Regions:
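Active-site nucleotide/adenylate-binding loops and adjacent lid/helix of ATP-dependent enzymes
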Residues: 10-165
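Contiguous C-terminal substrate-recognition/catalytic subdomains in enzyme active sites
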Residues: 165-172
Length: 172
């Protein structure tokens, strides 16, 4: 892995390096490249690739190069896939991956120094997406700002939820 898995690494390249034991824990995925062809032709090509890989909706779409979930979306329909394709940058690669049935994502930090035959795991963490609970009084923007985790990442969450920031979620 060129940059040791840091920001800007290809998810496809990293996932393809997984050995047989690790692969059984990775949800199936396909990698596609947004091109300059007709949007509907790209959509049909993506649908055919999904069908060939036995993938179906809902499906997770994510940039091949990403950070902190930027550009990651849960797509529930062909229409949502079309919208994702339409807004995705030209010539960029993205993954369509089966949605995992778990609430958390595991992060494993493995280090092998040059010259060593074997490395070691130095950190394991479970990563949960921050969530807020409506109280019937505060807007989504206010709830995000008040959340200890999400409040530190408003630069990520505000752009994702622009259309809903003034919405007041019901209690619970």
């Amino acid at each position: 892995i060129k940059l040791s898995g840091m920001v800007g690494e290809s998810k496809t390249d990293i996932l393809n390096l997984a050995g047989p034991v690790a692969k059984q824990w990775i949800e199936p995925f396909i990698t596609l490249t947004k091109n300059a062809h007709n949007l509907d032709a790209q959509l049909e090509s993506a649908m055919q690739a999904m069908n060939s890989a036995q993938l179906s909706f809902p499906i997770v779409a994510k940039p091949d190069l990403g950070c902190r979930g930027v550009g990651v979306k849960l797509l529930k329909s062909k229409a949502q896939l079309r919208d994702y394709l339409q807004t995705f940058p030209a010539s960029a690669r993205f993954l369509l991956q089966r949605k995992a049935p778990y609430q958390a994502e595991a992060g494993v930090f493995y280090v092998r120094y040059p010259g060593q035959e074997q490395g070691k795991i130095i950190s394991i963490t479970l990563k949960y997406a921050p969530s807020v609970v409506g109280d019937g009084t505060h807007t989504l923007k206010e709830l995000i700002e008040r959340c200890p985790r999400a409040g530190q990442l408003t630069h990520l969450y505000f752009p994702r939820h622009t259309q809903k920031l003034d919405w007041v979620p019901a209690e619970g």
